[in-house]
């Protein structure tokens, strides 16, 4: 089974692209969704122990947790030390299930693939991109988003240009949904061809 890492900076269309892979029948593990699930499950007591008062009714309150780690590099590192191994274990279980089921390709949707050392876990990398102004417009249209928040997020991410340089495949969502879907289909066809499936 070929493990495809899907990544891209905020606002570039990674989530939309992940849905396109799923709609084409490729299993997709969404790291962000896994975090949400873990926050209401096994991660909750671990997060509460590290950040008292951030769990309400057995579920991590993301706003309270965010207030505790935002701008505090040491706190963020503590949180990542709790969450990243759990997400990785969740992804490993996902891959094992789909490998056993005989899938030819599976996608790990990892927003911070390069930043968290995830490159070594995948066979190929797809980077989703779009022009910087398109990214800015998309992100600033989100509720509660500001120029300052966007700048802070981008400062923690590998620049888009560098991600594109490291990619095996690039999908430009700035060209529209149909063009992006055609690129997804072409990648799937190429990878299935490599496996002889």
Curated annotation (Swiss-Prot):
The keyword Transmembrane does not apply. Its EC number is 2.7.1.24. Disulfide bonds: none annotated. One of its GO terms (molecular function) is dephospho-CoA kinase activity. Its main location: cytoplasm. It comes from the Bacteria. Pathway: Cofactor biosynthesis; coenzyme A biosynthesis; CoA from (R)-pantothenate: step 5/5. Catalyzes the phosphorylation of the 3'-hydroxyl group of dephosphocoenzyme A to form coenzyme A. This is Dephospho-CoA kinase. It comes from Mesorhizobium japonicum (strain LMG 29417 / CECT 9101 / MAFF 303099) (Mesorhizobium loti (strain MAFF 303099)). The gene is coaE.
């Amino acid at each position: 089974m070929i493990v495809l890492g899907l990544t891209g900076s905020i606002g570039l269309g990674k989530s939309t692209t992940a849905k396109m892979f799923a709609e084409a029948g490729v299993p997709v593990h969404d790291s962000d969704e896994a975090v949400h699930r873990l926050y209401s499950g096994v991660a909750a007591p671990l997060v509460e122990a590290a950040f008292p008062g951030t769990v309400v009714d057995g579920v991590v309150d993301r706003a309270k947790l965010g207030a505790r780690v935002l701008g505090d590099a040491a706190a963020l590192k503590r949180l990542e030390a709790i969450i990243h191994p759990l997400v990785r274990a969740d992804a490993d279980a996902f891959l094992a299930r789909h490998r056993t089921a005989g899938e030819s390709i599976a996608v790990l949707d990892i927003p911070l693939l390069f930043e968290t050392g995830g490159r070594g876990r995948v066979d190929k990398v797809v980077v989703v991109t779009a022009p910087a102004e398109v990214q800015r417009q998309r992100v600033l249209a989100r509720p509660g988003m500001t120029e300052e928040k966007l700048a802070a997020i981008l400062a923690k991410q590998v620049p888009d240009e560098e991600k594109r340089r490291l990619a095996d495949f690039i999908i430009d969502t700035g060209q529209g949904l149909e063009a992006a879907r055609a690129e997804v289909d072409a990648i799937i066809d190429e990878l299935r061809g490599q496996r002889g499936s």
